[in-house]
């Protein structure tokens, strides 16, 4: 009879990180079951061959249709709405870890493991996500939406490693060719520019939305753009407009198909609204003296304070100015390296009145 509490289901892409994860867990005495989610592209031949070499069970979960109907659709819809999505943040709870949990239950595996560069810490009855030791590879930012039920089953073996050490480990274990492979794509279903992907998947963008106007903060037209979905807050390159000085995207209005341009100073803000949050312990978040927030992947955490508004949203006050706050991106809150929770950056419309009403309460 198989010992369930030693069976681990590993999300196995066939890349460097999932290969190292399998080998490390095997060394620790776990029985490994590999599942490769096919969400885009070709058959996962690499993963099959690696599983055979390691002598582990391997299955392929063909999730191409539901992945396209949920994650890819959301990605396109967010850009249509003038927001800047992060598909990994959406995928992890809605898709990746949900599917892995379903397969783990089906295959009688107690645990789920992935090659994320993050750690877990149990404190006061809660499981917290903790930033991985490799600051350049840390993926805690992408995991804030995972619930306690999933985190209790998760193992992240690479959290204590740097990418260099993982490559060295694979080479030592006889996987030298694998250790020299390049990095995986940042967004698994996009090769190249996301704008080309939008046009390919949603050709009506150019016919139904089409070109619109760049405007300044007074609403004066500055020139034409290719369509609001093709721009992001803070963007400077690729605007294809000459104003005699550097210009940045300040706001996007999908209803009017306008893109507001301005200078770098106009991107600065001391406040931000966030919504659809998941917080581990609200009392801890609101009272934390060392609280800091990341407003995009790999950005430096900015010291802040947070308040819950009556409408359920969060008002974040930065202790130093932040730049290019982009609706749709994630705001992930940290106490040191420990994730206390996260939220989606909301539309900042009407924030002036909110600030006036709450300025003395933060």
UniProtKB/Swiss-Prot annotation:
What is its biological role? Answer: Catalyzes the 2-thiolation of uridine at the wobble position (U34) of tRNA, leading to the formation of s(2)U34.
User: Catalytic center at which residues?
Assistant: 91, 188
- Naturally occurring in which organism (per UniProt): Bacteroides thetaiotaomicron (strain ATCC 29148 / DSM 2079 / JCM 5827 / CCUG 10774 / NCTC 10582 / VPI-5482 / E50)
GO CC: one term?
A: cytoplasm
Q: Where in the cell is it found?
A: Cytoplasm
Write out the catalysed reaction.
Answer: S-sulfanyl-L-cysteinyl-[protein] + uridine(34) in tRNA + AH2 + ATP = 2-thiouridine(34) in tRNA + L-cysteinyl-[protein] + A + AMP + diphosphate + H(+)
Matches recorded under InterPro entries: MnmA-like, MnmA-like_C, MnmA-like_central, MnmA-like_central_sf, Rossmann-like_a/b/a_fold
Region annotated Interaction with tRNA, chain positions: 137-139, 296-297
Single GO molecular function:
ATP binding
A Pfam family that the UniProt record links to this protein? tRNA_Me_trans_M
The residues that hold ATP are 11-18, 37, 115
Q: What is the name of this protein?
A: tRNA-specific 2-thiouridylase MnmA 3
Q: Which PANTHER family match?
A: MITOCHONDRIAL TRNA-SPECIFIC 2-THIOURIDYLASE 1, TRNA 5-METHYLAMINOMETHYL-2-THIOURIDYLATE -METHYLTRANSFERASE
Listed EC numbers: 2.8.1.13
On whether ATP-binding is a keyword of this UniProt record, the answer is yes
In the record, biological process GO terms are:
tRNA wobble position uridine thiolation
Q: Which domain of life is it from?
A: Bacteria
Disulfide feature? 91-188
Gene3D superfamilies according to UniProt: Adenine nucleotide alpha hydrolases-like domains, HUPs, Translation factors
């Amino acid at each position: 009879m198989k010992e369930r509490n030693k069976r681990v289901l590993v999300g196995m892409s066939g890349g460097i990180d999932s290969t190292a994860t399998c080998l490390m867990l095997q060394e620790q005495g776990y029985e490994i079951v590999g599942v490769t989610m096919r969400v885009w592209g070709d058959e996962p031949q690499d993963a099959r061959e690696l599983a055979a070499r390691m002598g582990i069970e391997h299955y392929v979960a063909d999730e191409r249709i539901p992945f396209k109907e949920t994650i890819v659709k959301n990605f396109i819809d967010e850009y249509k709405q003038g927001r800047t999505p992060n598909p990994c943040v959406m995928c992890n709870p809605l898709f990746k870890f949900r599917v892995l949990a379903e397969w783990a239950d089906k295959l009688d595996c107690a645990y789920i493991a992935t090659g994320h560069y993050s750690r877990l810490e149990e404190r006061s009855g809660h499981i917290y996500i903790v930033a991985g030791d490799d600051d350049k590879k840390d993926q805690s930012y992408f995991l804030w939406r995972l619930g306690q039920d999933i985190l209790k089953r998760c193992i992240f073996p690479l959290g204590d490693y740097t990418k260099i050490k993982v490559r060295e480990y694979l080479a030592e274990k006889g996987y030298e060719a694998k250790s020299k492979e390049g990095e995986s794509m940042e967004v698994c279903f996009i090769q190249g520019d996301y704008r080309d992907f939008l046009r390919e998947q949603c050709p009506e963008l150019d016919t139904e939305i089409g070109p619109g106007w760049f405007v300044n903060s007074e609403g004066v037209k500055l020139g034409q753009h290719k369509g609001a979905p093709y721009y992001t807050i803070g963007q400077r390159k690729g605007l294809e407009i000459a104003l005699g000085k550097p210009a940045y995207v300040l706001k996007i209005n999908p209803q009017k198909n306008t893109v507001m341009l301005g200078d770098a100073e106009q991107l600065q803000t001391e406040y931000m609204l966030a919504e659809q949050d998941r917080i581990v312990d609200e009392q801890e978040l609101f009272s934390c003296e060392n609280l800091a927030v990341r407003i995009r992947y790999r950005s430096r955490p900015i010291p802040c304070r947070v308040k819950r508004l009556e409408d359920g949203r969060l008002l974040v006050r930065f202790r130093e100015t932040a730049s290019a706050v982009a609706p749709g991106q994630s705001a992930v809150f940290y106490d040191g390296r420990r994730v206390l929770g996260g939220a989606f950056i909301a539309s900042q419309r009407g924030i002036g009145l909110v600030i006036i009403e709450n300025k003395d309460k933060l």
